[in-house]
UniProtKB/Swiss-Prot annotation:
Its main location: cytoplasm. GO terms for molecular function: aminoacyl-tRNA deacylase activity; ATP binding; valine-tRNA ligase activity. It comes from the Bacteria. InterPro entries: aa-tRNA-synth_I_CS, aa-tRNA-synth_Ia, Anticodon_Ia_Val, M/V/L/I-tRNA-synth_anticd-bd, Rossmann-like_a/b/a_fold, tRNA-bd_arm, tRNAsynth_Ia_anticodon-bd, Val-tRNA_synth_C_sf. The keyword Repressor does not apply. ValRS has two distinct active sites: one for aminoacylation and one for editing. The misactivated threonine is translocated from the active site to the editing site. The keyword Zinc-finger does not apply. This is Valine--tRNA ligase. NCBIfam families: PRK05729.1 (NF004349), valS (TIGR00422). One of its GO terms (cellular component) is cytosol. One of its GO terms (biological process) is valyl-tRNA aminoacylation. Keywords: Aminoacyl-tRNA synthetase, ATP-binding, Coiled coil, Cytoplasm, Ligase, Nucleotide-binding, Protein biosynthesis. It is an enzyme of class 6 (ligase).
Length: 861
């Protein structure tokens, strides 16, 4: 045996990962049914977070499980260039150095970002290795590598030639901080308190006025009309009249449009088509002009008159002051409304009309909708199917151009000489129409998600017809979070059908969001994040992985507390110590058929078959928590607490050979079942077992042996467990030392010698048989044909009765408190799932103990 006395993960993890990579275990073997996953590529903006750790753990469980089942497994790793996020991060870094992107210029800035990418890609790889991910590093990809760049250009040109990519002047979401357009999906709408301002717009040549309500008075500088609903009786006679725009002294018409909500404000609204998407649509219907009043930094431009140069919030203050001075501000109300924010920097988005590149999505989405409707592609949990379809039914064109420097440059060139637009897969140096070399490439880059949408097939070599693409596309499952169903999942499905004529994957498993122990989203601003790499270094990678798996229940977020990692570090120690016990007791071990089995042998082997079935079925169904919980309960509660303890009866006898073989079989099988969850620990222990195999990584997944399922043995042994627990409980409540031999009387059915020896060994009992209940005894177990009593003679019974009554009273108060807690809606909605589970467990334990104490008290009264 080559095992230390304690589990030290730091000594075994690096050793085994390097060995696995060196041996090529993570590469596909080339035979068998393919099982393929492409990793959701982490952004190169910093360290991976706990959400990544969950995502990687669940994927690795699937891959290791399928590899052991004989599948031809391929897990493709890679990283995302993350255009806007990376550019922001590098700009912050440059700012700390007293530099700016503009000072450096585009070429030098891109050089610095490539250095950044190299550094963080290396760090991300190291972090993924730390988590034990069995990815094939020889196939690592990057969303901005040469192969992906070629794929991106081909897709762009193809869609453009089919009329599905177009350039146009439309209302878009502009981030003044990031200085780029965002897609609708990149805008986070946050409910905020605000003011609703009621402003008088006087009729031309009259002292009368109409009152409009607005949350953005600064935008009135760009107003071109006032609109009312044609069905609104209050405004029947004013359509076609004009009003004078306050502060700007510009006449604007009053129009009618059914979009206007008569219930909002006064039922009359200002129309600012250059800065509101709904107003934009109204203006197009009524052929109104567009007056843009903001520049790229959301400051008022020359169209704003004397307010030019003010930022939007300064302008709001100034406009309100002037409106009030001039008597135009009627009143102000408090309201709540949703405000769009940039998903990267949190700045408030400014709607603007700009020339941008778009993908026409309606026709592209049809096949992607059908695939999910007919379950050609399956969402797990199923409720995410409705979320996906709702978005797809209401899909809008995708704005794909970004005013950034880092990313895939739009593959479009413009001839300065003849104004020709050239869309090409290769760089253009000369105009194909006029021959001029005065050519400029489009300044914009493509949305990061454009390249990510091609990930399942571009990582396998597309547009080249590679062996990998032929063999491993479509992939098997995508494991991801719900927050990128629209950004990524939907677009991958669309592009897969468009360019491969096949789905990109069969299953989409949507995992949980990790929150802190109070249920809050983990974030830098709250300072409540838990770093997975720090946890791996502190507790070991296997306990971190097992913790994440055991809490990965479908349909509920994970409320994570660091102490959970310590709990499953203790489980890892338990596995280590159990393995040491088995190995220490293998003197003269020889493999032999499992014949002449004891009751305990038959029981544990039967339970083992059932845990094989449960774990296998749970992994197939993505029920990772059920698989992990079943393994935990089997190994700790059944194998360690009962079988190993019972084996001590035999290991020093002549009959130890069979017990040794059962111990080896159960430990070997358990380690193989544990391997997808705890790869390092399972490999280290498995290598010390007297079993044949090169590595647990490529060992066979356990199969159920139905000949070993024995319901009768389970029933009989579990009855003994109840008797032993009953005796232990009585001894504990009566303050009898656990190891003190105590007289135990059995009335009714006689036990066989084997059963008696288990009870005596595991409960410190001396068994006698009686024909009636003896005096001075406490009941330990009752069944239809058997009663078991513990002798309490010699104890001060009156004193024990008083003590028991006091304990019962105390427990009843605890029970009432737990019941009150579990009926509190506030506790149930806000407490972590683990805290609720603990409270229920505590209540169950209290009720069990009350039952025992009341039984003993009744016996003594």
């Amino acid at each position: 045996m080559n095992l230390g006395t304690r589990y030290s993960p730091e000594q075994i993890e690096k050793k085994w990962y390097e060995r696995w990579v060196e041996k090529g275990y993570f590469a596909p073997k080339g035979s068998g049914i393919p099982f393929v996953i492409v990793i959701p590529p982490p952004n190169i903006t910093g360290r991976i977070h706990m959400g990544h750790a969950l995502n990687i753990t669940l994927q690795d469980i699937l891959v290791r499980y399928k590899r052991m089942r004989g599948f031809d497994t391929l897990w493709v790793p890679g990283e995302d260039h993350a255009g806007i996020a990376t550019q922001n991060a590098v700009e912050r870094y440059l700012e700390s150095q007293g530099k700016s992107r503009e000072q450096l210029g585009r070429e030098k800035f891109i050089e610095i970002v490539w250095e950044w990418a190299k550094k963080y890609r290396k760090e991300i790889r190291q972090q993924i290795e730390t988590l034990g991910a069995s990815v094939d590093w020889s196939r690592e990809r990057f969303t901005l590598d040469d192969g992906l760049s070629k794929a991106v250009r081909k897709v762009f040109v193809d869609l453009y030639n089919r009329g599905l990519i177009y350039r146009g002047k439309y209302m878009v979401n502009w981030c003044p901080r990031c200085q780029t357009v965002l897609s609708d999906e990149e805008v986070e709408h946050i409910e905020e308190s605000a003011k609703l301002y009621y402003v008088k717009y006087p009729f031309s040549g009259s002292n009368e006025y109409i009152v409009i309500a607005t949350t953005r008075p600064e935008t009135m500088l760009g107003d071109v009309a006032v609109a009312v609903n044609p069905e609104d009786e209050r405004y029947k006679n004013i359509s076609g009249k004009t009003v004078v725009l306050p502060l700007m002294n510009r006449e604007i018409p009053i129009i009618t449009d059914s979009y206007v909500d008569p219930e909002f404000g006064t039922g009359a609204v200002k129309i600012t088509p250059a800065h509101d998407p709904n107003d934009f649509d109204i203006a197009k219907r009524h052929s109104l002009q567009f007056i843009e009043i903001f520049d790229n930094e959301a400051k008022i431009n020359e169209n704003g008159g004397k307010y030019a140069g003010l930022d939007r919030y300064q302008a709001r203050k100034a406009v309100l002051e002037d409106l009030e001075k001039a008597g135009f501000l009627l009143k102000v109300e408090n309201i709540n409304h949703a405000v769009g924010h940039c998903y990267r920097c949190d700045s408030v988005i400014e709607p603007r009309i700009m020339d941008q590149w778009f993908v026409s999505m309606k026709s592209l989405s049809k096949r992607a909708i059908e695939a999910v409707e007919n379950e050609e592609i399956r969402f797990v949990p199923e409720r995410w199917k409705k979320v996906y379809l709702h978005w797809m039914y209401n899909i809008r064109d995708w704005c794909i151009s970004r005013q950034l420097w880092w990313g895939h440059r739009v593959p479009v060139w413009y001839c300065k000489n003849c104004n020709e637009t050239i869309v090409s897969e290769i760089d253009i140096e000369e105009c194909p129409k006029c021959g001029s070399k005065s050519i400029e490439q489009d300044e914009d880059v493509l949305d990061t998600w454009f390249s990510s949408a091609l990930w399942p097939f571009s990582t396998l070599g597309w547009p080249e017809k590679t062996e990998d693409l032929e063999k491993y596309y479509p992939t098997s499952v995508l494991v991801t979070g719900f927050d990128i169903i629209f950004f990524w999942v939907a677009r991958m499905i669309i592009m897969g059908y468009q360019f491969m004529q096949k789905k990109p994957f069969t299953d989409v498993y949507i995992h949980q969001l990790i929150r802190d122990k109070h249920g809050r989203k983990m974030s830098k601003s709250l300072g409540n994040g838990i770093d997975p790499i720090d946890m791996s270094e502190k507790y070991g990678t296997d306990p971190v992985r097992f913790t994440l798996a055991i809490f990965a229940a479908q349909g509920s977020d994970i409320k994570l507390d660091e102490r959970y990692f310590d709990t499953y570090r203790k489980f890892a120690n338990k596995i280590w110590n159990a393995a040491r016990f088995v190995l220490i007791n293998l003197d003269n071990y020889k493999p032999q058929p499992l014949n002449e089995l004891s009751l305990a042998d038959r029981w544990i082997l039967s339970k083992l078959q059932k845990v094989i079935s449960v774990v296998s079925d749970a992994i197939e169904k993505y029920e990772f928590n059920i698989a992990a919980r079943s393994l935990y309960e089997f190994f700790w509660n059944e194998f360690c607490d009962w079988y190993i303890e019972s084996s001590k009866l035999v290991l020093n006898s002549e009959k130890k050979a069979i017990t040794q073989n059962v111990l080896v079989k159960v430990l070997d099988t358990s380690l193989r079942l544990l391997h997808p969850f705890m790869p390092f620990l399972s490999e280290e222990l498995w290598q010390n077992l007297p079993v044949h195999g090169e590595s647990i990584v490529i060992s066979d997944w356990p199969e159920v042996d139905v000949t070993l399922i024995n319901e009768e043995a389970e029933k009989n042994f579990e009855k003994l467990v109840q008797i032993i627990r009953g005796i232990r409980n009585v001894k504990a409540e009566m303050n009898i030392p656990p190891k003190r031999n105590t007289k135990v009387y059995i009335y009714g059915e006689t036990l066989c010698k084997e059963e008696s020896s288990y009870i005596e060994h595991l409960s410190g009992a001396q068994i006698s048989y009686v024909k009636e209940k003896p005096a001075c005894c406490a009941t330990a177990f009752v069944s239809e044909n058997q009663h078991v009593y513990v002798d309490v003679a010699g104890l001060n019974l009156q004193s024990e009765i008083k003590r028991l009554m006091k304990n019962i009273e105390k427990l009843q108060k605890e029970r009432e408190w737990q019941l009150k807690k579990l009926s509190d809606d506030k506790f149930l909605s806000n407490a972590p799932e683990e805290a609720i589970s603990e409270a229920r467990q505590k209540l169950s334990e209290i009720e069990d103990r009350l039952k025992i104490l009341n039984q003993i008290l009744g016996d003594l009264m």
